[in-house]
UniProtKB/Swiss-Prot annotation:
GO function terms (MF aspect): actin binding; actin filament binding; ADP binding; ATP binding; ATP hydrolysis activity; ATP-dependent protein binding; calmodulin binding; GTPase activator activity
Region described as Tail: 1046-1980
Mapped zinc finger ranges (Phorbol-ester/DAG-type): 1592-1641
Subunit organization: Interacts (via IQ domains) with CALM. Interacts with RHOA. Interacts (via Rho-GAP domain) with ROBO1; this inhibits the interaction with RHOA and the stimulation of RHOA GTPase activity, and thereby increases the levels of active RHOA.
Protein name per its UniProtKB record: Unconventional myosin-IXb
GO BP field: actin filament-based movement; establishment of cell polarity; lamellipodium morphogenesis; macrophage chemotaxis; monocyte chemotaxis; regulation of Rho protein signal transduction; Rho protein signal transduction; Roundabout signaling pathway
Annotated stretches, region: Interaction with RHOA: 1699-1704
Length: 1980
């Protein structure tokens, strides 16, 4: 596909692309392809339409466009809306231009049938394999040869079967095959998508041979073998050129770093991964056999700690092929870096380095250069630059490198020609522009350069000769200069890479390290023309072949023979003779070459003659015809002919001294550094030069400053200068000076109230001076991290010496830079032998793994298998013999001791490591005797048997674990059974005893009934007999009396008649005594029931003097006449009037008690029935006269005395007619106050709820002889019948009351006025006293029990504004009133001014009552429970929004408002944020006083504010608590703080906070708390994490270091590109392909399907419980919030377990519906137990299984900072739901650990408890290993908690500093506004630190002296500008504080350098203003 832009009209018309479509139709004929034009917006239907029109196809048919990718083996049918151009852009670049079929990426046009199916022409070809398989199944065709992944498993071992097996696997694109533990890799010359990270995970910790052969498998085995055996390992990669050694090395390094880093790539891993591309660019080139041939050898040794963490690495290079720089053969190229540079640089860089095109350079264009992959080379240059940055090259360093490369290319363009005229025999060098450019690039003089390139200087004893070069000598000198310069550059790059890979701790401490070495050395080469380089390369391959045969054949067979096991020796080809031919002293070819090179007149012919003379009879040395200057050596891989030309010159290839002197005199320090002999010496000289230059610069700067100072002194000063202001008289009495001093003193006094807390105020005042005139030089800001100017990992002499010592043997270039040395440097061959021997020595100390790389074909064709070439390589590598010995040998070898330790579980207990025990075990396990042998000291096993033993060991361990578990479960079950049995026996015994007692009781009852019945019968008979007798007697007596009476009557009549007649004349005026005696009988006696029972209380209240009932005891004379009268006819004894009164009182009290119980039960039935009963009570109640004019001065004293239980008996009094116009009537029902408050020892008082309404509240006193002792009766009367006054409870027990009263405030000595109310402190004490006395009461009535079951709310009252004597501190002791009165009085007085005056809050709405009706907490708290609230509101008539106009402001009490606000719910986090700011303002108002009670209040409020911050900063932003929980939390904080300080009285503090909370709820509406979507809202969460989730995948950014493929589009991912990697399933894809993925993650998808059947909240995956609105599961959030509100101060919070039944109940409730669960009903330990249970039951822990190994490896890092960085890096790859939930949980644990002194929960204890819940090992892991990992798991969680604690403290300290600065700025702004008209403004002392200090406060006088005016401030300024700055600063501080607050819970992975920057910034708060000022100036 080719693209064409539209030129200047490109903006209007999009680019067009040419697509090649290959029709696959029957009617297409001979048409091979069709070319159409399309754009990125063209769809598939548009392209098909163009193709049909171009090919003249039948338009009525249906066609489809098919995308073919042969690499993936798939065909994709494009939809009609797809864009073919977009698909092409995803292909490799080589296939994008023309995309022929040969590249494997093309489009097909196919025909679609009517049913939608596609007609495939090649379907017959596809059907052939299927038909063949059917024939094989029927037995008609022979079965194909089996696919053996291990050549040792071949049934018949020969070359043919070996070759056939490899070819069969190669055709199936299986390029890896095992030969025992040796890996055979065949180069396919094509990228295969088998190297993605998921393959690394697949082969991790797997046995060799369990999965398909792979290079990752060998790397994994080497890594874990090193960790298991603690022995160094090495991987030797061998093979001829083009066999894929370099690529295999890259794969190995990638896998080893991936196994080590496990999600956390430190600097060493990144450098190792980046070093490969850099070395390949500078050391690899394209040859005829290989497009990426290594022209040098390298050995990368990766050092590990014993835990498997990378410690460092060393790269050693061997014999760079320098001759390739100046000459190449046909179809070969120079080093890659030149082409990258020329084709990839930008135009600016091209001009800077003066670069041309590759065809313009002689070193690059020697055989008609034709570059076809230009686009790929451009991208390779970008990847090279990225790799150089990973290694640590700075941009300036890269420019220096590219400048040297450009100079090398220009050296090749230097031409020579002989001078045409003159006697001068010299040469002319040119062209001039090349010389000019070269001198500029190298920074040398042009004349010196020309002289060096054309003349040679020779120094003799007496003379210095300058001789011109011949033409050939000049060219040789030029090329030698270029080669030496490039070699020096390559050495310098290797040196810098080693420095970057060096661990600086290796210079300070000696730590035992392990290592894995990967050898990638040049392969065996046999070209058409072989020279000195091929001779050295093949010698190195001979050494490696010898090393291979030594380990595979010789050493192993010798070990078998030494152990005495039966073994038949296997013959192998030994190449030691060839090695001796080349390197044996003194006749080896290398030594002969060195001798001949030292002879001045020797030539190549003399050298060849000497070779033939010495080795004519050697079978490995073959001569050639005399005329041919060459010789032949018989290598292990075959015969190679070497051309003898240039052997001597290349062996002594070094710079001439004049060239070295030229480059060392360069003005470029980099060039001098390259040519320097000793890098350490060069570095030291550079340091010295830099120091001298710095001194010179400083001296010059000092001189210039002195000159400016002199000029300034000599000049004329300005009218207003600093000196003028300072010279003003301090004691002047000018008005401005006096005004200044007064204002200064005023400020100093006001500053005393600021939050110094014992600190120096000047420390904070320093920020204010900067507020007036912002400076632009102070740029440090919290949100901006300054770019690092000084780079890290700078060179130093110590590290350089260490690197030089490690690579001393490889100084091939530096050894040739000797100047004027008498002793010649060593030759190239000598240095090569030295470095090769060093390499073999390192390999000999390690256990080797071998990879045999084989070239599939010589033409570099993709997936082409050349049988002959492959067979040749198999033969010379001895693969057949290798397979044979691997097949017959024993790969597993154990000493007896190692075997016993390894398989101890399988052996008997306490067995000795001996031959007999091991043999018995193997016999017992029935191991095949053919697969093992036992030698003298070792056991030899085949790999299959070793794996079988490992499996048996694993199974035995699992069996024993299960056995232990079963035993433990048995013990638990037995214990449970015994407990159940004991419980059953106890229940049975109780039941039997109950039955016996029941029988006895029934028997006794029967006997009692019988006795009663018998007695009844006897009494009945007796009474009947007595009644009969009495009746008879009465009849008899009556008869006698009547008879006597009749006689008397007759006699009387007679006497009367006689008397009437005789006394008719007597006087009629005197009354008779009988009439006077009958007068009282006409008046009926009044019923005692009609009298009132407690009228004496009313009488007492109406007494003029207000005396107590004790002082006005009614006398017996005050009784009613009815009580004093006795009937005249009564002959029996009548009870006295006192006894009658007592009986009436007793009956009245009993009736009241019955009424009390009845009303109490009625109130609990239904709230709707209360109002009618209250109305009935009002209608039938007593009517008392009202007298509001007399103030009740002794009300409190009256209450105190009436409370005494020993008052004398009171007699009901019937008032006289004038005072009682209507008789007292008994009410139909008595309304009793059910809110019976218990009694506390601290007080014996109870204040009425509405005491200030008048004197109408009646008081009732119990009878002392009452057995219940606490039954009370209260009557209510009020002229306004809308609401009734609340009741006052009375109690008994005079001694107890007196004792309690003595402990409380002596209130009886302080009589109150009529309007005085109880203080909040008194009310709270009363509330507390009631509960304690109720506990002490031994006998309780029903009323008392009901009062004890409900928590009481204190009735707080506000004093009337008219009463100046009463105040909030009226109840305090005398000594403390004066201290605390001012502040608290100010607090309560000023809040009425700035808050809403509305009285709407007084009324209780129906909503709050209904809500309270649902809650019934049983805890003893300060708030009122719902049931109590209902009882309180029973007697009140709800007003439903109407104001009670009869109530005054003074009657609105705090307690009434608290009842309303306590049940108010918190809707969102902003409400808590407003409350936090509200409390901050209130606390700042109270900081001026330092009384103990205020100090307690301030500190408690600060702690409470910290709790609020942690609440509204949680991720969810949702609050599940109310103000009731806040009040309880504050009470807990105050209680603990008071216990620490020894304070006993905390009631006043609680009352103050209660009033503040009440004021806050009245001051704000719910609409004020609605979140505003703006800048502040965005700060609530941190920036978007680097993790991207899709379909269960957790993708993170990933830099590709080896060839990989996208698993979605199957296209190539370029090296060093950014891709996305799933941290769970290791899926890799392009960033643009993420949203196209339709498959779910292999792990998370399975979990969701398994858990979908049982919905709930326990045992469910975290991501299923979260959503966009709820980022944290509701169960977790609700449990954590409740614990943080009520349980942080509980000792052993998570250590103790709750009740099992309560825990189960809570779990079941949360499982059903968490939103409806009331956690207040459950104990705190049950809640914590459910929290731990929820975490344990997660299918996958919060710290997921995928990151389990990563966390363990992070803990194993040596340094704490590295551990923390690794842990946070792994946390960043967690899924979003897990990360957010873990963040919330860790934040909770931090809050718990901060209170370790109280709850005894340290970070270590919390880690022990929560580590098994958060970080569990996978189920398929080894149990033994998992047990060892417990300590690491605990350490990981503990470190996380401690680090988050540290960050939390740092952030809170920053917030405190910001609040202090905000307070100062606000005070300053207030003063400026108050004093705006004044001409002078206050100055402050200049800052000297920028942070708050702990120094003691200085006296005021000293403050006045030091807080003087700054001169620049005294000069005047713009106060308006200062106000603006202050307002901006306050706003900036608020934003900064809010940002820090919202970042409190974050698991922030920032590094230490950024943390230091942040801490410095936060410590100096003025930086905020400076940054804002700078930004504003920049914007302007």
């Amino acid at each position: 596909m080719s693209a064409h832009e539209a030129g200047s009209s490109g903006r209007r018309r999009p680019a067009t692309f040419h697509l090649h479509i290959y029709p696959q139709l029957p009617s297409a004929g001979s048409q091979t392809s069709c070319r159409v034009t399309a754009t990125k917006d063209s769809t598939t239907s548009d392209v098909i339409r163009d193709v049909v029109a171009s090919l003249h196809l039948d338009g009525s048919k249906h066609y489809v466009l098919v995308e073919v990718k042969e690499s993936g083996g798939e065909e994709w049918v494009l939809d009609a809306s797809d864009s073919p151009v977009h698909r092409v852009l995803l292909w490799p670049r080589r296939a994008q231009k023309e995309h022929p079929r040969e590249d494997g990426y093309y489009f097909l046009l196919q025909e679609r049938n009517a049913d939608g199916s596609i007609q495939y022409l090649h379907v017959q070809l596809l059907a052939q394999p299927t038909a063949a398989c059917r024939l094989v199944e029927r037995g008609l065709l022979p079965r194909p040869q089996a696919d053996f992944d291990d050549l040792c498993n071949l049934p018949e071992l020969n070359e043919a079967n070996l070759l056939q097996s490899l070819k069969l696997r190669f055709v199936q694109q299986k390029i890896y095959t095992y030969a025992g533990s040796i890996l055979v890799a065949i180069n396919p010359f094509k990228f295969l998508p088998i190297y993605n990270p998921k393959y690394v995970k697949m082969y991790e910790n797997q046995q060799l041979g369990k999965l398909e052969p792979h290079v990752f498998a060998l790397a994994d085995v080497a890594y874990y073998t090193m960790l298991r055996k603690h022995v160094n390992q090495c991987i030797v990669i061998s093979g001829e050129s083009g066999s894929g050694k370099t690529q295999s090395t890259n794969f190995l390094i990638h896998c080893l770093t991936a196994l080590s880093q496990k999600g956390y790539a430190s600097g060493v891993e990144r450098t190792i991964l980046g070093a490969g591309p850099v070395l390949e660019a500078f050391g690899n080139a394209k040859t005829a056999h290989n497009n990426n041939s290594s022209r040098f050898g390298k050995f990368i040794q990766v050092n590990y700690l014993e835990s498997g963490i990378v410690r460092g690495a060393v790269v050693e290079k061997y014999l760079l092929e320098k001759s390739r720089l100046v000459s190449q053969e046909k179809d070969e190229r120079n080093y890659h870096v030149f082409y990258y540079l020329l084709l990839g640089v930008s135009e600016e860089e091209r001009q800077e380095f003066q670069l041309k095109q590759p065809q313009d350079y002689f070193y690059l264009n020697q055989h008609n250069l034709n570059i076809e992959d230009g686009e790929d080379l451009k991208h390779d240059f970008e990847r090279l630059q990225q790799a150089m940055e990973m290694v640590g090259f700075l941009p300036a360093t890269k420019k220096q490198i590219f400048s040297v490369l450009s100079a090398i290319l220009y050296l090749g363009n230097v031409t020579y020609k002989k001078r045409a005229t003159g006697r001068d025999e010299g040469l002319e060098v040119g062209p001039p522009e090349v010389l000019d450019t070269l001198s500029q690039l190298l920074k040398v003089k042009r004349e010196t350069l020309v002289e060096v390139l054309t003349k040679r200087k020779t120094i003799t004893v007496n003379d210095k000769l300058i001789l011109p070069y011949s033409l050939s000598e000049a060219i040789t000198a030029r090329d030698s200069m270029a080669k030496s310069l490039y070699s020096a550059l390559f050495d310098w790059i290797v040196l810098r890479i080693n420095h970057a890979l060096l661990n600086k701790k290796d210079m300070e401490e000696a730590v035992s390290c392990l290592s894995i070495g990967v050898l990638d050395i040049f392969g065996f080469e046999d070209f058409e023309r072989n020279s000195f380089e091929q001779f050295c390369i093949n010698y190195a391959n001979e050494q490696l072949q010898y090393y291979f045969t030594q380990h595979i054949f010789k050493l192993e067979q010798e070990e078998y023979q030494g152990e005495g096991i039966s073994w038949h020796n296997i013959d192998y080809t030994d190449n030691v003779g060839c090695i001796h031919l080349i390197s044996k002293k003194p006749t080896g070819l290398f030594y002969l070459l060195d001798e001949e090179s030292n002879f001045p007149h020797a030539t190549s012919h003399t050298l060849l003659a000497k070779f033939k003379q010495q080795h004519e009879d050697n079978k490995y040395f073959l001569g050639t015809p005399v005329l041919e200057p060459a010789f032949i050596i018989q290598h292990f891989a075959g015969r190679v002919k070497y051309q003898i030309k240039d052997f001597r010159e290349k062996n002594m290839d070094y710079m001439r001294p004049d060239i070295v002197a030229l480059l060392r005199g360069s003005d470029s320090s980099y060039v001098r550094q390259l040519i320097g002999m000793d890098p350490v010496a060069v570095f030291r000289w550079a340091v010295l030069r830099a120091a001298i230059r710095a001194m010179a610069v400083l001296r010059e700067a000092g001189r210039l400053r002195a000159e400016r100072a002199e000029k300034a002194e000599a000049g004329v000063s300005s009218p207003v200068t600093r000196s003028h202001v300072e010279e003003l008289p301090r004691g002047a009495n000018t008005p401005s000076e006096k005004l200044y001093r007064d204002l200064h003193n005023q400020i100093i006094k006001s500053l005393k109230g600021l939050p110094w807390q014992g600190e120096d105020p000047r420390r904070l005042l320093q920020s204010l001076s900067r507020l007036q005139k912002p400076r632009t030089f102070f740029l440090k800001s919290k949100g901006i991290k300054q770019k690092q100017i000084i780079p890290k990992n700078l060179l130093d002499s110590k590290s350089l010496r260490l690197i030089i010592s490690m690579t001393l043997h490889d100084r091939t270039t530096k050894s040739l830079l000797h100047l004027h040395k008498k002793k010649k440097p060593p030759s190239i061959s000598a240095q090569f032998q030295t470095s090769l021997n060093k390499l073999l020595e390192a390999l000999g100390k390690a256990e080797p793994f071998f990879i045999r790389c084989i070239r599939s074909n010589a033409e570099k064709k993709e997936l082409c298998f050349d049988d002959e070439l492959v067979l040749q390589q198999l033969r010379y590598t001895g693969m057949l013999e290798t397979v044979r010995i691997r097949r017959s040998g024993y790969s597993a070898k154990y000493t007896f001791q190692d075997f016993t330790e390894q398989f101890q579980v399988l052996l008997p207990k306490d067995v000795q490591p001996c031959r007999e025990a091991i043999a018995a075990l193997l016999e017992k396990l029935q191991v095949d005797r053919q697969n093992y042998q036992i030698g003298k000291t070792k056991v030899f096993l085949k790999e299959t048997e070793r794996q079988a033993l490992q499996e048996r060991l694993h199974g035995e361990v699992l069996r024993r674990i299960l056995l232990l578990q079963s035993w433990f479960r048995m013990v638990l079950e037995r214990r449970h059974f015994v407990q159940m049995k004991h419980a059953a026996l106890t229940i049975q015994a109780c039941w039997r005893s109950y039955r016996v007692r029941r029988t006895l009781e029934r028997t006794r009852a029967a006997v009692y009934l019988q006795a009663a019945w018998r007695g009844y019968l006897q009494r009945q008979a007796y009474h009947h007999q007595r009644h009969s007798i009495i009746r008879l007697q009465s009849l008899c007596r009556g008869h006698l009396q009547r008879r006597s009476f009749s006689q008397m009557m007759l006699e009387k009549q007679k006497a009367e008649q006689a008397r009437e007649t005789a006394g008719a004349e007597m006087s009629e005026g005197e009354p008779s005594p009988v009439a006077a005696g009958e007068q009282p009988s006409e008046h009926p006696v009044e019923d005692p029931e009609s009298l009132g029972v407690e009228t004496e209380t009313w009488m007492n209240s109406k007494s003029p003097n207000g005396l107590s009932p004790k002082k006005e005891i009614p006398s017996p004379e005050m009784e009613t006449p009815a009580q004093k009268t006795v009937p005249a006819e009564s002959h029996e004894k009548v009870p006295s009037s006192r006894e009658k009164r007592e009986s009436r009182r007793q009956r009245g009290l009993e009736h009241v008690e019955r009424q009390n119980k009845h009303i109490q039960s009625c109130r609990e039935e239904n709230s709707t029935l209360r109002e009618p009963s209250r109305k009935a009570s009002l209608e039938t109640g007593e009517s008392f006269p009202e007298d509001t004019k007399e103030p009740r001065e002794d009300g409190l004293e009256t209450w105190t005395e009436t409370a005494a239980p020993s008052c004398p008996k009171q007699v009901p009094i019937v008032g006289d007619p004038p005072r009682s116009p209507s008789p007292l009537q008994r009410p139909a029902s008595l309304d009793l106050d059910s809110r019976v408050s218990p009694v506390l020892p601290s007080s014996s008082l109870e204040s009425p709820q509405d005491e200030d309404k008048g004197e109408n509240s009646t008081k009732v006193q119990d009878k002392p002889e009452s057995p219940s002792g606490s039954t009370q009766i209260q009557r209510y009367q009020h002229p306004d019948t809308e609401r009734l006054a609340t009741a006052v409870e009375i109690w008994r027990g005079k001694k107890l009351a007196s004792a309690m009263l003595s402990q409380s405030l002596d209130l009886s000595e302080k009589p109150r006025t009529a309007g005085a109310a109880l203080t909040p402190t008194e009310e709270r004490r009363i509330s507390f006293s009631t509960s304690d006395v109720s506990k002490l009461s031994p006998v309780k009535t029903s009323t008392e029990v009901d009062g004890d079951l409900s928590a009481k709310k204190p009735a707080g009252h506000k004093k009337k504004s008219e009463d100046p004597s009463a105040g909030p501190d009226a109840g305090l002791p005398t000594g403390s009133q004066g201290d605390s009165k001012s502040a608290f009085k100010r607090l309560f007085l000023h809040k009425a001014k700035d808050k809403k005056p509305s009285l709407e809050g007084v009324e209780e709405t129906e909503g709050s009552g209904g809500q309270a009706a649902q809650e019934a907490p049983a805890r003893k708290t300060l708030d009122v429970p719902s049931s109590q609230q209902h009882r309180h509101t029973t007697g009140e008539k709800p007003l439903k929004g109407k104001k009670n106009r009869n109530r005054k402001v003074g009657q609105i009490t705090v307690s009434e408002k608290w009842r309303e606000s306590v049940f108010r719910k918190i809707t969102n986090a902003n409400e808590l944020k407003f409350l936090d700011e509200f409390l901050l303002n209130k606390v700042n108002d109270l900081r001026s006083q330092k009384t103990p009670i205020e100090s307690l209040f301030i500190e408690a409020t600060e702690r409470f504010r910290s709790n609020i911050k942690t609440m509204y900063s949680v991720p969810n932003g949702k609050i599940h608590v109310g103000y009731k929980d806040l009040m309880e939390n504050y009470q807990i904080v105050v209680s603990n703080l008071a216990a620490e300080r020894g304070e006993k009285d905390t009631n006043l503090v609680l009352n103050v906070f209660q009033s503040l909370l009440d004021e806050f709820t009245r001051s704000y509406n719910k609409t004020d708390f609605e979140p505003v979507k703006g800048k502040a809202q965005k700060k609530k969460r941190k920036q978007e994490r680097a993790v991207q989730e899709h379909n269960g995948h957790v993708f993170a950014s990933y830099q590709v270091n080896i060839p990989q493929s996208c698993e979605q589009c199957l296209s190539y991912i370029w090296l060093m590109d950014k891709a996305l990697l799933c941290s769970v399933c290791k899926m890799t894809c392009h960033k643009k392909c993420v949203h196209k993925i339709q498959s779910y993650c292999s792990y998370t998808g399975r979990r969701k399907s398994e858990l979908g059947a049982e919905p709930g909240h326990f045992g469910v995956c975290v991501d299923s419980l979260t959503s966009d609105k709820a980022s944290v599961p509701i169960v977790l959030e609700k449990l954590l919030e409740h614990v943080e509100m009520h349980g942080l101060y509980t000792e052993g919070l998570y250590r103790k377990s709750g009740a099992a039944n309560r825990t189960r109940e809570l779990r079941q409730a949360l499982q059903t519906d968490p939103a409806t669960v009331k956690l207040e009903d459950f104990p705190i330990h049950a809640i914590t137990g459910v929290l731990k249970q929820w975490l344990r039951e997660l299918p996958e822990p919060l710290m997921t299984f995928a990151q389990y190994g990563d966390f363990l490896r992070a803990v194993e890092l040596p340094e704490k900072q590295e551990q923390l960085a690794a842990i946070y890096a792994v946390l960043d790859h967690l899924p979003e739901a897990n990360h957010t939930s873990l963040e919330r949980l860790i934040f909770h644990l931090v809050k718990v650990a901060l209170l370790e002194d109280v709850n005894r929960m340290s970070p270590g204890a919390l880690a022990i408890i929560f580590a098994p819940c958060l970080l569990r090992c996978p189920d398929n892991s080894d149990p033994l290993t998992s047990m060892k990992d417990v300590l690491k798991i605990t350490t990981c969680v503990e470190m996380l908690i401690k680090e988050q604690m540290r960050k939390y403290k740092v952030k809170m300290e920053e917030i405190n500093h910001l609040e202090a600065a905000e307070s100062i700025a606000f005070r300053r702004l207030s003063l400026l506004r108050q004093n705006a008209p004044w001409p002078l403004k206050l100055g402050f002392s200049s800052p000297y630190e920028g942070v708050r200090t702990k120094s003691p406060r200085t006296p005021v006088v000293q403050d006045l002296e030091e807080l003087g005016a700054l001169p620049e401030e005294a000069a005047g300024g713009d106060e308006d500008r200062e106000k603006e700055i202050l307002m901006e600063r306050i706003q900036s501080i608020k934003e900064e504080k809010e940002d820090i607050t919202y970042r409190l819970p974050e698991l922030d992975p920032r590094g230490s350098d950024e943390e230091n920057l942040d801490s410095e910034t936060s410590a100096s708060t003025e930086s905020l203003l400076e940054e804002r000022a700078v930004r504003g100036a920049a914007e302007e």
